[in-house]
Amino acid sequence: TGLSIALVMTLFIIFYVKFAPIYPEYNRNRMLTVTKMKSYPKDNDKSWNCSAVSYDEVKMLQDLPHLEAIGATASNYRENYVEVPDNNEPISVTPLYTDAGFWKVFTFRFLHGKPFTQADIDAKHREVVLPVSVARKLFATDDVVGRRFNMDAQEYRVCGVVEDVSAATPSSVGDMWLPITLNSWVTSDTTGKLVGSVGIYMTAPDAEDKEALKEEVR
């Protein structure tokens, strides 16, 4: 019947969006994610702690033999407010904080400019990549590299503009992307533990290398 066909098509679309290679997550078939970590004393597995992952783990994993790229993301668990020119009402945004490797793991289409660099991240420069819809909302145009705006009373500079990202790709979507070192949850995590506040994303050179990379991570 028509209803059963519609249901099958709906399930197919959901499955496709969740698992197929779609923008900007084209590398799903060779990607590994580490977004949760459970830690406990060697002699007591009942006393455990489960959380996101420490940013220190990026350094621990970056020399694995079957690793092509590794990146990290973090949220600040709250909304930020951007001042819009000629508008008394600020707009709320939810940024995604990333490192330089993020732009190698995920394949964004840059319309203008480029991503922030490792030097920007190390220096905590307030560089930002905007999706085109947010760029137009803030500046009424999309070629805005070098333009500046205020968010939560801090000035930021636009270094790149990308095609919009769908909410169906939660690992990479954001209202804007900022250097991960601007996230206080990440920079305050100096305990040296495996648990922390980031998610880690890795790609193997080929889909055939994914299982080998998984074993190396373990």
Residue ranges of each PLM-predicted region?
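Generic structural signal for small/hydrophobic residues in well-ordered secondary structure
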Residues: T1, K18-A20, L32-K36, L61, ...
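N-terminal Sec/SRP start-transfer signal
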Residues: T1-V8
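Conserved SAM-binding loop
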Residues: L7, P95, M202
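A structure-centric signal for secondary-structure junctions around beta-strands
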Residues: R28-M31, P90-S92, K124, E155, ...
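Short acidic/polar micro-motifs at solvent-exposed secondary-structure junctions
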Residues: M37-S51, A72-G101, P115-E127, S166
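Mid-to-C-terminal secondary-structure elements
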Residues: D99-P115, R126-R218
